[in-house]
């Protein structure tokens, strides 16, 4: 299994329940795909470097996980179709 790190930015209009629901949804994508979530770090609301879709701030969430090489592709697909995600990035921590 490879180690990965993903950072995603949620829409700032989400309330606490909406944030938790989205984080749990993405964690379940990882665990249902055979991965293992190691750490979830909620950075909170921060100002964006530039405006994205008429939004100046977002809620940053950092997740470290282990999985096989196919899971990041599925997670990327889920991020792309989610309306609550402003931006996302998935990187491999080791080869």
UniProtKB/Swiss-Prot annotation:
InterPro entries: Ribosomal_bS6 (IPR000529), Ribosomal_bS6_sf (IPR035980), Ribosomal_S6_plastid/chlpt (IPR020814), Transl_elong_EF1B/ribsomal_bS6 (IPR014717)
Ion transport as UniProt keyword: no
GO biological process: translation
GO cellular component: cytoplasm; ribonucleoprotein complex; ribosome
Keyword presence, rRNA-binding: yes
Cystine connections: none
Pfam families (UniProt xref): Ribosomal_S6
GO molecular function, one term: small ribosomal subunit rRNA binding
Keywords, sorted A to Z: Ribonucleoprotein, Ribosomal protein, RNA-binding, rRNA-binding
Entry superkingdom: Bacteria
Cited NCBIfam families: S6 (TIGR00166)
Family: Belongs to the bacterial ribosomal protein bS6 family.
Function: Binds together with bS18 to 16S ribosomal RNA.
Name this protein carries in UniProt: Small ribosomal subunit protein bS6
Species annotation: Clostridium acetobutylicum (strain ATCC 824 / DSM 792 / JCM 1419 / IAM 19013 / LMG 5710 / NBRC 13948 / NRRL B-527 / VKM B-1787 / 2291 / W)
Taxonomic classification: Bacteria, Bacillati, Bacillota, Clostridia, Eubacteriales
